[in-house]
């Protein structure tokens, strides 16, 4: 890792010492469901929904038995409720039929589930299973470009660039601190550049703010 990247990550960790996944869950399977629901939805809204959802369904078997229409109603407010309900039902079927009802414990098995892509499998691996993964959501994707860490056109390309720039033991902290920075400071439309401690690293600041002062 370069001195520049080490300083960048150290600054992020100092600014967000409590950065972590903000989705509420008790088991890795519940996190898997929550991550599916989080697509195009805020963590706050997902937590409101899962607070009620997990009272009536906690396991793959529970979701497998639940009628699709019932699940759709319970998750309606997260948006794209039909697609999300189908995904949750499908992955629950796979876990019961292929894994005996036990939650897969590695990235490859998670990714093999219907309705589970790279990002979802990476989040569960990183957050709940203690594995080395580096999920790239919209915040990580945006900041990787603004901070000059990647010019990748896809989340997978950005993920590969970040993995090349930072050692595995930094991936967890990098993922969560970038999300917090993107969520609370470096927002998509109106970033709070005046409050940011990463100005020296930031292409966006240098091109759009400093040169206009």
PLM feature spans:
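Catalytic cores of DNA base-excision repair glycosylases
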Residues: 2-212
